[in-house]
Amino acid sequence: MGCAFCASTIGGKVRDLRPSEMLGQLTAAAHDLGERIDGVVMMGIGEPLDNYENTVKFLHLVTSADGLNIGGRHISVSTSGIVPKIYELEKEDLAITLSISLHAANDTRRSALMPVNRKWSIDELLTAAKHYFDATGRRVSIEYTLIAGENDTPADAKELAALLRRYFARGDALHVNLIPVNPVKESGFSKGSRESVERFRENLEQSGITATVRRTLGPDINASCGQLRRASGRA
């Protein structure tokens, strides 16, 4: 999707995954772990709603009693903001969690970070997200990558809180996941200090927005989202 801070986008799109391939990832993980998989997060390399038909087939398969019988409440689907597909997803009777990759609180900054915003604005995106909540009753997750000097100041936190309150008056309607950016040589972005990340979270909480700093895994060995794929492509 061309997001400026993301390692996943550097290599470009190769092709869409088929439902059987998505299911294969789950069965392989279950085999390797020796235990049942009871939760799915569709996030990371690729845009699930840009592969809508295959994504939905996979979701119906894993939630079906004749499939893996994983409850919709244990499944999250992330999108960078393909607005028309959000309205389609709410009609699928899946009751899954919708995760919005937001990463900025105004259109100017978000369009610079995420090209998809030039087609569908923040207002269009959050209006669709609110509609999804109203239709399904499922809390919306807001993903916000913290980038030092770009979107991580106390003023940015206040702007984000004010934005979200305009669309989600109920405190239980959404939750913000804060994600310190993973360093990617090609992007030049860096993450702030642990103190600045915690201060951002506190500013959101003080404004009535529930927020959690997501635990990061793999950056010490370049194994975070998209990094291994990028390293493999360079090898």
Language-model regions, residue ranges each:
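Radical SAM enzyme core and accessory elements
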Residues: 216-235
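Conserved AdoMet/S-adenosylmethionine-binding subsite of the radical SAM
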Residues: 21-207
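Gly/Ser/Thr-rich beta-alpha loop segments that engage phosphate groups in nucleotides
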Residues: 4, 46-48, 83, 220, ...
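A structural preference for short, hydrophobic beta-strand core positions in alpha/beta folds
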Residues: 178, 213-215
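Short, surface-exposed helix/turn micro-motifs that flank interaction/cofactor sites
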Residues: 4-7, 177, 226
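Residue-level detector of anion-binding/catalytic polar loops
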Residues: 210
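Short, surface-exposed helix-loop/turn micro-motifs enriched in polar/charged residues
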Residues: 13-14, 37, 69, 213
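Canonical Radical SAM [4Fe-4S] cluster-binding loop centered on the CxxxCxxC motif
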Residues: 1-20
